Structure formats: C-alpha cells, structure tokens
C-alpha cells in the first residue's frame, strides 16, 4: 500500500476534525482494538488537535500533534502505524516469521505460509481478516502490519500461498513520513 508512497506527491489535503467525529473514531478504535481502551487518552489526548491527512488512493492518515497514529483505506478498518506499534506493542496480536523471511517482508512482500510454519516462526491462533503485527525471530520490534488472509489453522494445514497480506512495513513511504504538520 505504501511501497511507492511519497509525502510530497501523494498527500492531497489535511483537515482538523470536530470533537464529535473524534469521539466516533475513538469508539471505532476501541471496538476494533479492545486492548487499546486504557491507553487511548494517552495516545490521543483530549485537548490536542486531531487531523486527517487525505492521500491518493483513498488513504486517510489520522494524526495527533503531527504524529501519524492510524491509517485506513476508504471507510475500511483502521491500522496502527509501526511507530505507534513500537510504543504500544500490545495493541495487535502478534505472528512471528523466521529469519529467512525478514528481507522479503522488508521489501514489501506478503508473508507466505512456510515463513510462518518453519522452525523459528511462531504462529498464534487468529481468524481470517485479523489485523496482526509481524514480529521477526530474534528481533524486539514489529517489522510489519498485516492482515490474515487465512486462519492460523488453515496456514498450518495448507502451508502454501499467502498467509498474511503485508499492509505497512519498516522503511516504506509511510515510515519515512515520520510527522505531518
């Protein structure tokens, strides 16, 4: 999604949100990520201005004080940015890939089933369409945010094809954006 993303070319406008809209977004985030509720006022303080940065391909990035927190495409689900995920790693369930998959994931490739079932990888129970943080064997922080394309059970059974779709990874265009004022 952000492989060829460039802040100067892809951002179309930025709007400040009303309190009622912010409340709706917070409720949607709590519904989507139940573990985030105790931390939401710390992530999105009440007095700080919340803005939506609109980009090409119907992508919206939610920012607070210029810090990129969440993004979504069209009216779809919100995904946390990796910078937020590194501060609050418990927001998303984790899946772990083996060392051999790291370079492919960091180049934007989807996570294939064998990279999740080999030694060194850890596959935790998760349903289809669950948003997950992809961790790497021997690494502390998440290297990608993805969406389960198969359930964990099916990944173990089939062990072929795309298991997790790579949505946002380290060093992609969104990662390089850092802040937006």
UniProtKB/Swiss-Prot annotation:
Tissue: Ubiquitous. Over-expressed in T-cell lymphoid cell lines and in non-Hodgkin lymphoma cell lines as well as in a subset of primary large B-cell lymphomas.
Residues modified as Phosphothreonine: 81
Signal peptide: none
Any Gene Ontology CC annotation: cytoplasm
PTM per Swiss-Prot/TrEMBL: Phosphorylation is critical for stabilization and promotion of cell proliferation.
Recorded domain comment: The PUA RNA-binding domain is critical for cap binding, but not sufficient for translation enhancer function. MCT1 N-terminal region is required to enhance translation possibly through interaction with other proteins.
PANTHER family: MALIGNANT T-CELL-AMPLIFIED SEQUENCE 1, MCT-1 PROTEIN
Protein name: Malignant T-cell-amplified sequence 1
Protein source organism: Homo sapiens (Human)
Name of the coding gene: MCTS1
